[in-house]
Amino acid sequence: MYGKIERIHFVGIGGIGMSGIAEVLLNLGYKVSGSDLRGSEITQRLESLGGEIFFGHAAENVANADVVVISSAVHDDNPEVVEAHLRLIPVIPRAEMLAELMRMKYGIAVAGTHGKTTTTSMVATILSKGGIDPTIVIGGRLNSLGTNARLGQGQFLVAEADESDGSFLLLSPTIAVVTNIDADHLDFYSGIEEIKDTFVEFINKIPFYGLAVLCLDNGNIADVLPRVKKRFTSYGMSAQADFRATDVKLSGFSTSFVAHHKGVRLGEITFSMPGAHNVLNALAAIAVAMELDIPFETIQEGFAGFGGVGRRFHLKGEANGIMVVDDYGHHPTEIKATLGAAKAGFAENRLVVVFQPHRYSRTKELFEEFVKAFHDADVLILTDIYPAGEAPIEGVTAEALANRVRRHGQKDVTWISDRDKLCEHLERVLAPGDILLTLGAGNVWQVGETMLLRLKAAKES
């Protein structure tokens, strides 16, 4: 960036998408400040790296900033945004700052309604194993790094591309991965056709020497293939895919499959994340790695050492014979995939699910899809909707969803609003051999951590 820009301020710096960019900028030598409503492990890490963190939003926080970066969750009436405009300080979306970082490297952008974080993490892990030393900006904590960002010395930047507000169109990657296209963020998009149009525009932004990596198993991607004008390769379980998986085996937290490229057997891949959906994510990572001439043996080694991603079927702990697992899944497609993975890998275990719906708008738009998403849950408990800054919508409640799921035929469904009562209910319900799965993009993970403490205390008493 032009040398006159020295101090960069982030409004909502504790968010997973914002913090990664902030960390890379700190490591590049920029002065970084940011504000958030409360402290967290993320803000503590940024402070340890030299960032200045303010708690609460106030006009004076931007006094010395040369540019202010905001996420889509920050509104125009935020006092820091208002003050920045008064001071004629540029206010830009996080995607524009990510685009600026990507402009200095060869960008690998991973987009898609689902699977972005896991796929980005797999790509980053394999490229690192291959000696490419990429800069990494991920929307989740890569367990092997203990963070979601890293400044590499190589020529590539691997980043997650967020389609939620269309701002991923600001990016200009050399390699664009699209894991799937599904109906989501219908508070921003008019419907699936506009979503498909936007992804086509994203894919066609790559340069003539670039590559698009596209999942052929996804019907919406298959629909738009005739509109793709740039070089692409495909992946999936389909026999027509360029990169294909066969002999998929799911056992516990382990997944293995045999990878093929254009009919040629490459070899077996094994990694420690459950689920057939993660086989697809792995195929995308293989396609990217082979485009960069990383030997398949190195790719195998990268997957063998892949430690997974925070909040993606993450084992939090075990007590009294009960495993506590947390997952970020909050869309019906993600929920079905996660519960299916749990059932496939742990067929003998009872699955007790605590789901926290995320956003009133998503719950309303995808209500009937949510109703059908929990078939593989043996016990289902819903807690109140996490608003993520949205105002309530009349009639759209977790209680209404629980009632509808019950009428759909799910037998053991409960709605509990109060967290203490929810944990007390879980203490009565859980038994040795169960898997307790907390599910959602809000703060439902706290239920799992509380239950681990209670289960351990019960064991010691």
Curated annotation (Swiss-Prot):
Catalytic activity: UDP-N-acetyl-alpha-D-muramate + L-alanine + ATP = UDP-N-acetyl-alpha-D-muramoyl-L-alanine + ADP + phosphate + H(+)
Domain of life: Bacteria
Record keywords, A-Z: ATP-binding, Cell cycle, Cell division, Cell shape, Cell wall biogenesis/degradation, Cytoplasm, Ligase, Nucleotide-binding, Peptidoglycan synthesis
GO function terms (MF aspect): ATP binding; UDP-N-acetylmuramate-L-alanine ligase activity
E.C. code: 6.3.2.8
Pfam families the UniProt entry points to: Mur_ligase, Mur_ligase_C, Mur_ligase_M
GO CC terms of this entry: cytoplasm
Predominant place of localization: cytoplasm
HAMAP family found in the cross-reference section: MurC
Matching NCBIfam families: murC
Protein name: UDP-N-acetylmuramate--L-alanine ligase
Gene: murC
